[in-house]
Amino acid sequence: GWRPLPMYDRIGAVYDFVRNEIAFGYNAGDELPASAVLADGIGQCNTKGTLLMALLRAVGIACRFHGFTIDKPLQKGAITGLAYVLAPRRIIHSWVEVAFEGRWVNLEGFILDAPYLTSLQRRFPVRQRFCGYGAATPDLSAPGVEWRGQDTYIQKDGIADDFGVFDSPDEFYARHGSNLSGLKRWLFTQVIRHRMNAQVRRIRAE
């Protein structure tokens, strides 16, 4: 189990589990409980963040939720066609802040699993600023997503609005809602997200 590990290793074990055992993908909604994200075996920033917070707290690590929006172009490539047209111009985004050595450390680099990120790096083999396919980073070739006791980012360069920190994802969604509602949400849940996940799987398999 993770609980007996030193704090640094405990955070790292939970972080690596959520990053790589829960593959990048699109769930039915942002507000899913951690148990549903775990059952899906896939997630994006918000759903993987919910699971990360639940697991960190389960092993005695204090953490909090930081809500944002990101600009839609960050998702272009991972989201294509009708899905991209229907997506809001600014998409609800979040990262997790973990209490470590007397400060809050921002954790965002868990969103893209290593096989998917490696495929992006092969597809775009340049050391430069990159935005698209679920990443927005100053250096795609070395984005700094591994847990080293410091902030990790993979979408930070796409952030538009900052909604501040919350004790839980539920508190945030109660105040700011989620990305889709009504007919758009139904289409996303029943049809579009499956196409998006197929696209992500294609990229990962390259």
Positions of the model-derived regions?
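Generic structural hydrophobic/aromatic packing signal, biased to beta-strands
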Residues: 14, 56, 63-65, 107, ...
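Active-site neighborhood of thiol-dependent amide/isopeptide-bond enzymes
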Residues: 26-92
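Non-catalytic alpha-helical scaffold/packing segments enriched in small hydrophobic residues
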Residues: 13, 51, 95-98
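Secondary-structure boundary elements
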Residues: 1-40
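His-Asp-centered catalytic microenvironments across diverse enzyme cores
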Residues: 70-206
